[in-house]
Amino acid sequence: MSDSDPAANLDGLRQAIASGDPAARLRAMGCLRPYPAEDCEPLLLACLEDTTVLVRSMACSGLGYKPTAAGTRALRRMLDDEPDPNVRAEAANALARHGGEQASEPLLALYRRDAHWLVRRSIVAALADERDVPAGVLAELADLALADDDVHLQLGGVELLNRLRHDPDRGAAARARLADLRSSDDHRLAAAALESLLPQDPC
């Protein structure tokens, strides 16, 4: 096969990842974008076991963009077993990309038990961006974020409430909470709440 043959190139990436060298693994994972998820899955799963934090983090990111059932299970395991908060945060982001409906409950549970600021910020940002997160999860996560001492999480809570403004069951409560937040002592929080209550441009 020629070097331009996709199968030949994929074989080279497999060899690089099998080498166990962190630099080679990082380069190889960066070249997986053109390949289908089923070809990438075993390579990314292998890199989750690497001792290098950056390799594990990049493997999580790759699994987010190459969703498979095995990848989803592996990411959920990383939420529980991974010791490094940077990797847990990346796993949370990646799992959210598999779909807000299936990721929302595991990520809400992770928020409750993992107090690291980066993990929590990643969860709030990831679920705020997903369209199919159940309204009940958004509401509970907003309450948790707004109760946190971290103003960045509080601002994320405002964004979550904004997502709920027009929900038939939770919209009235979300709008009332946003109205209350306009009088917050923190001008950033008050401004974010005020902006959320302004009429939205339909364009």
Question: Which positions does each model-derived feature cover?
Answer:
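Non-membrane alpha-helical segments in proteins
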Residues: 26-31, 53-65, 90-93
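Alpha-helical adaptor scaffolds
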Residues: 112, 117-118, 125-132, 151
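Alpha-solenoid HEAT/ARM repeat scaffold
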Residues: 26, 42, 57-58, 73, ...
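Alpha-helix N-cap/helix-start positions at coil->helix boundaries
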Residues: 22-23, 38, 53-54, 69, ...
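Alpha-helical segment of the N-proximal tetratricopeptide repeat
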Residues: 12-35
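Amphipathic alpha-helical scaffolding segments comprising HEAT/armadillo-like alpha-solenoid repeats
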Residues: 3-16, 37-49, 68-81, 100-113, ...
